[in-house]
């Protein structure tokens, strides 16, 4: 699947557009910080991470992540010794040839274990800072793709 080269595929397996909200259980103060909700869980912390200079360098089975390291989330890999920040107020330094993306575009693969209590409540996974696109796999199964999720 190469959704990042398909201009029609901005979001795959995502919810329809909606207002941002945090659910609160009955009796909880819905005007307090989102972290106070019993129905909210941050996935911040140390994640397994593997950096690739190019998407073509990735292993076919990227769930193994040989040579992985720990990366704090939230953060960005440019501030942790990989690649360099890409900010410019003039012509962007990446070749522009839609819908094609250069093969040497850097890739970061993040992975972590997560256990949840199957209590019958619906879970919604939200990414508030992925840049520029993300492919989401759960237990090795593709479940979604999104661009510019921040």
Regions picked out by a protein language model, each given a short descriptive name:
Residues 1-90:
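Accessory carbohydrate-binding/adhesion or oligomerization-edge regions at the termini
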Residues 3-18, 29-34, 48-52, 82-84, ...:
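Accessory beta-strand-rich segments of carbohydrate-active enzymes
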Residues 97:
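N-terminal [4Fe-4S]-dependent radical SAM core
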């Amino acid at each position: 699947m190469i959704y990042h080269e398909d201009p029609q595929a901005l979001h795959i397996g995502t919810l329809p557009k909606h207002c941002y909200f945090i659910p609160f259980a009955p009796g909880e103060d819905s005007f307090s910080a989102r972290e106070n909700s019993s129905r909210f869980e941050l996935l911040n912390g140390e994640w397994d991470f593997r950096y690739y200079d190019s998407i073509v360098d990735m292993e076919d089975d990227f769930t193994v992540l040989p040579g992985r390291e720990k990366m704090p989330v939230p953060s960005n890999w440019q501030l942790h010794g990989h690649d360099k920040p890409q900010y410019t107020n003039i012509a962007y330094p990446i070749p522009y040839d839609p819908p094609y993306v250069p093969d040497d575009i850097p890739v970061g693969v993040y992975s972590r274990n997560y256990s949840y209590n199957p209590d019958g409540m619906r879970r919604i996974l939200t990414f508030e800072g992925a840049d520029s696109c993300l492919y989401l796999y759960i237990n090795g199964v593709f479940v979604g793709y999104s661009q510019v999720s921040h």
